[in-house]
Amino acid sequence: MKSFACNVKVNAIEYFHIKLNANEEIKVMKQKLRNLSAPANIIFAILAVFIFIALLQWSGKFLGLIPGMEKADDYLLQAIVETVVLVIFLGITYLFGLWDIFKENAAGWTRSLYTGGFFIVYCLYAVVSGIYLCFLGEHGDVKAFYNIIFFFIAVCLVGLVEELVFRGVVFNLLLRAFPKTKGGITGAVVLGGVLFGLMHFSNMGAGVKFSSCLIQVISAGLMGVLFCMIYASTRNFWMLAIFHTVVDMGGLLSSGIFEGGGVADRINEFSAMNCIAFVVLGIPMFVMLRKSRRIRLEMLYNNVTIIDDEREGAKLAVVSLVLGICSIIFSFFGYLMGLGIVGMLASKMSKRAKQYNNAIATAGMITSIIGFVLSVICTIGMMVLFASGIYDRLVNMTM
């Protein structure tokens, strides 16, 4: 009995010794991965993209070998694949010492949302358009409730996983590689966006034709540059994950609710008309890359304290008022309800920088609230018209 107890004690000591050594090895590996040279960081960033694509492709093929899975809903399969990728890249994030991305928020939520204001407008435009398309387009039968749930889960996972891979891992590795200057940070931003865009060529393996895929690649590249610039300015991972999810959800809403089309079918509908997205995304991209914004980034990454003065507060007040007025003017169909939200954010920031004698910011807040409320009312009104059939009757009367 005494011998047995001694053996148990020895085995326990050996187990904890092995575990301790394993922990030490992981610490050493993490330290090495944190201190990679600039070329090595770039190589690992590009390698992460290939790992991501390979995981998507091979996980999907593996699921196809499981009996019965070939009949499963496309979005269920995508949710499973994205979960696998998420788990693996969480491990990669930990090994490269990037775990803090989930806690960072350098600018605070108000400034973060204002900095990403374009995507507030774009996200709500995508959602409103998607809802209207569900009412107006020709669709198959409504999917089973559980398949609609799979759609929402899959889209949420896609947004989360792609932001984890391309902003959380790839872009942060590029930031480590490039110098913390205006040019260096801009280089990381542009390369991060380009890699995000090129990744979408992998959709050709899912049946997307080249012309449609090329439009998606260019649009995604421009969007990737915007996402990288916003992330560099705010260090707010969760905000971008939400933006990404909402944009995808708006664009794919009809395919998630109705039978008869998947993601590839939706992308194959892209035509020359979709090239307008290049302008819609290109203008805010160049605005975000302006010199003053890049100077602010250089200060941020060199630990220089940035404080908005009264002059900045006055500018924000004017922006708020302009956005508020525009939100009222364009409130009719509800597409641009995001203008009112961004106007409210600008007004709030203006009042922080200029607390007194700031009537313009107050006017901006009031007009922005009015514009947002009108947009919501108009959107609900349009949905009622579509659902009741009144809209169709009005169209038929004019024909």
Model-derived features with residue positions:
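C-terminal membrane module of polytopic membrane proteins
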Residues: 245-305
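Functionally important transmembrane alpha-helices
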Residues: 54, 212-269
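Low-complexity, intrinsically disordered extramembrane tails and loops of integral membrane proteins
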Residues: 1-29, 299-314, 399
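Membrane-interface helix/loop boundary segments of multi-pass membrane proteins
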Residues: 164-191, 232-236
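Membrane-embedded alpha-helical segments of small multi-pass membrane proteins
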Residues: 315-352, 359-388
